[in-house]
Regions:
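Alpha-helical transmembrane segments and membrane-interface helix-loop junctions
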Residues: 1-168
Length: 168
């Protein structure tokens, strides 16, 4: 593995670590928001109008960011039926992996391209409870798209180099 690939690997796994920390923070915020809503409703028969919307936004970001981590860790959904027909280590299996990563990178590009449109349109609409432009929440599509592309390209490079050198 040359210096450029080591640097790319450092960036990719650094971003993954940062995203994992952000997910932990979002999960904590979501739990506190839901818990405070439950306590206020149960004890005081009062409600925080913004808590469920905040929890929903946190959940959406968690889902999308978590899926990007899943791409890097290769834990995303695959067509297992195709892999069951191919012997382990066979060239067809490697081609299927590459094809899958190319599709994920393309999906990331689609997320970025059309996510920007959603963000622009969302900046003119305000969320009901939080009173912020919904475009901020729609940014999760663009961020996830960039992460999909980054992780898929990294894995493609690693798999291509690993295969050429005789190891995976």
């Amino acid at each position: 593995m040359n210096a450029i690939l080591k640097g790319f690997s450092f960036v990719v796994y650094g971003v993954e670590k940062a995203v994992a920390h952000i997910c932990s923070l979002l999960f904590s915020i979501m739990i506190v928001s839901v818990f405070s809503e439950i306590v206020l409703r149960s004890l005081f028969r009062a409600s925080l109008i913004w808590s469920s919307e905040l929890a929903t936004y946190c959940f959406m970001w968690l889902t999308f960011l978590g899926s990007a981590i899943g791409v890097l860790r290769m834990t995303h959904l695959t067509a297992d039926l195709l892999y069951k027909w191919v012997p382990e280590g066979h060239i067809v299996g490697k081609i299927l992996e590459w094809f899958q990563l190319v599709l994920i990178a393309i999906l990331g590009w689609v997320f970025v391209k059309y996510g920007i449109v959603f963000v622009e349109k969302g900046m003119s609409r305000m969320s009901y409870a939080l009173g912020i432009p919904t475009g901020y929440n729609m940014m999760l599509i663009v961020v996830t798209g960039v992460l999909y592309m980054l992780n898929a390209v990294y894995l493609l490079i690693v798999k291509l180099i690993g295969w050429e050198n005789g190891h995976d």
